[in-house]
Amino acid sequence: STLLASSAASDVYKRQEKWVKYLNEQNYDIIITTASLSLRLGMLAPELNAKTIGWQHNCYAGYLDVPNVVFWKQECLLQEYLPKLDRYIVLSDYDKRDYKKFLDIDTEVKINPRSFVSERKCDPKSKRFLMATRFVYAKGLDLMMESFEEFCKQDDEWQLDIIGAGDLWNQIVADAKRRGIEDRVNFVGYTNEPEKYYLNSSVFLLPSRWEGWPMVIMEAFEFGLPVIAFHTGAMDLIIDDGKTGYLPEAFDTKKFTDAMLKLAHDEELRREMSRNAIWKSEDFAIEKAVKEWNRLFNRVMGIKTFYMKNEEQILECREKYPLRTSYAEFVKEYQIRDNTILYEAFGGRGMICNPYALFLYLLEKEEYQDYTHIWVLEDFEDNRK
C-alpha cells in the first residue's frame, strides 16, 4: 500500500509539472478557473508566472455542505491552497462572510450580470407561472409540486410551465400525476426558445434549496417577471421582498403557496412588481460588471491606471464639471517619452467634452504643465465639434 501511495503521489506531481510547463509556455497574464478547478489552480499557483484567479459559481453551502459535491470534506485543502491564488471571487457578501468565518479565507465579491437585454416584456395579464430549471434535488421541484397542489385547490385557472430537464424528470412527472395536477403543469423539457415562455408568463418561481447567484432571476427581471423564491443564500440581495417578488421562509411550502395566490389574484400588483423588476434589471447591466472586472485585472497586474493615479483630481473635477468627466475612468495613459504622455479615450455621441474637460483641468496642475499631452479619441466622427 505504501508503494501504491508513493506511485500515485509521483503521478500527481508529474501531472502538475506538465501543467505548469504548459501554462508558463503560453505567457498568459492572468489565468481564471471556476469551481473545483480553483483548488487545482491554487496548487499550481506558486510555480506559475501568470496571476491566478479562482471564481466561485455557487453559494458557500452549495460547494461545502452538500455530500459528494465540489468541495465536500475538503476544508483543509481549501485553507491550504485557495490563499495561494491572487484572488478568489465569490458571488455575494454572504459567501464572503462564510469563507472568512468558517475557513478564514479572504475573498472578493463580483456579481454575475444579466446575459441579454430584451425590448419585449411579459404580459402581466397572463395567468401562467414559469420555472426554468434543471431537474435535480437542489432545485426543489418536489417542493414546487407540493406548493402547486395546494395552490390548485384554491385556484382553477392558472397553469405552470416548467422548462428544463435532468435526472429527476420521471420522478417529478410522476409526482404531479400522483397529486392530480398533471393537467395544470406543462412539462416542456429542454427548449431552444425560452424567450417564448418568459413572454407568455407573468410570475417566475424558484423553489431552490440553495443557489449562488441565479441567472434565471436576472432573466426573469429582464422580461418583467416578479420572482417568488425561498429566502436562502443571497436571494435577498437580488429580490426586494414585496417589490420585485416575494421571499417566503425557506422551504415553507404553505407560505410559498400564499405568495403565489397573492400575486395570481391581484393583476395590479403584478403590474407594479413587473415595472419594479424591469428597473431592478438595470442593476445587473453587463457594463457594470465589465468595469468591475477591469478594475480587478488592473489591481492584480499592478497596473496603475490613469484614473487610479489621478483619482483625487478627477473627483475634484467632477464637482466642477459633473456632466463632463463621468467617463474619466475609461481613459488609458501611456508615457511614451520623458516629457510626452499619450492618452487613449473614447468619444461617443456628445462625449468629446469628457476627456477635454479633464485635460484642461489637469493642465491647471503644476506637475502636468511641462508635458506634451497627446489625445487619441475613438469614434471621433460621432462627436460634436
Model-predicted segments: where are they?
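Short His-centered aromatic/hydrophobic patch
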Residues: 33-38, 56
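A conserved mid-protein helix/loop that constitutes part of the nucleotide-sugar donor-binding site
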Residues: 127-150, 167-173, 254, 353, ...
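Conserved acidic donor-binding segment of nucleotide-sugar-dependent glycosyltransferases
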Residues: 241-242, 246-253, 262-267
